[in-house]
Amino acid sequence: MATVFCKVGGGEEAVPKKEALNVINVIDQLPKPCPNPKFINRSMATKGLLLPSRRSLASFSEEENTDVMMHMPVEDSEYSSDDTSMSPIPSTLMNPIKMAVTQPNSSFFAGILEGELNKLSLASVVKNTEKDNLAICPRSSKSQIATRGLLDLDNPALDTDTSSTRSESSVVLDVPEVPFICEHTVGDSTAVISWTYAAGKQQVSFYQVLLQEATKPADKDTPKIKTRPWIFNKILGTTVKLMELKSNTSYCLTVRAANTAGVGKWCKPYKFATVSTDFNSFPETNPIQVTVQRKQPHRRTVSMTMEEMRRLEDLEYLYPY
């Protein structure tokens, strides 16, 4: 209730009249922000498979020149790479993922990795089942298409409205191609590895990297000792930086890609070696670094039809050797 004083006549103050006014709180009229209880950190993760040990299998750190520094615990967090682009020709200077390699842990890394892959395969089976059920409908909404596979939002061809014809969603139907390791740069304790993938074919969700110390030929009486591998999972970029490596040591690295259809094949083991540390000849402030680049061999497939083969037979008949 509010009291209003009115003036009447020649300015003399009359008896106050009370008038009932409905005072509306302006603040209540303002639109209230709708909190999102299911806030999801959409930074795609690059995570190494970890074990309950005092020493972590892989620890990541961001570049010093990044705009935002993410301080997250190693055990329970996933780390994102600045280099999330999947360019056919990666560069080692575009903020690669950093991985600190420590003493290898026990051998059930493979079991954890297979569990991740089984989940990935199970998800693809469910997606294929949903696709079969939705194929009965002549029209399918965009929301249904977005939940069944990986969509390239930058491609305007996929953003078409459905008409009387049956629409086809961008569902990954095959596993990715085998990556090709094209470049590496090594120092005394670090290594930057880059690879490419077949662009324009199957989409890639993430990569998996397996690193293993190369076995050296021992004496004849002593058998070779198998080293335990390091397995790094959910890598988004095409460049990784390995740190805390042993100097003057050979390593083998292999990469494979994965998407909703499953995982592809491992590439051929790529062998590299760190340089030796010689502080007498080279100062510590100017370490030695070696960069090696290679190109993927191009293969051409020649096909012949039956008519062309018959022409060759006719030529052999007309012009014998």
Curated annotation (Swiss-Prot):
It comes from the Eukaryota. Residues 175-277 form the Fibronectin type-III domain. Pfam families: fn3 (PF00041). This is Fibronectin type III domain-containing protein 8. It comes from Mus musculus (Mouse).
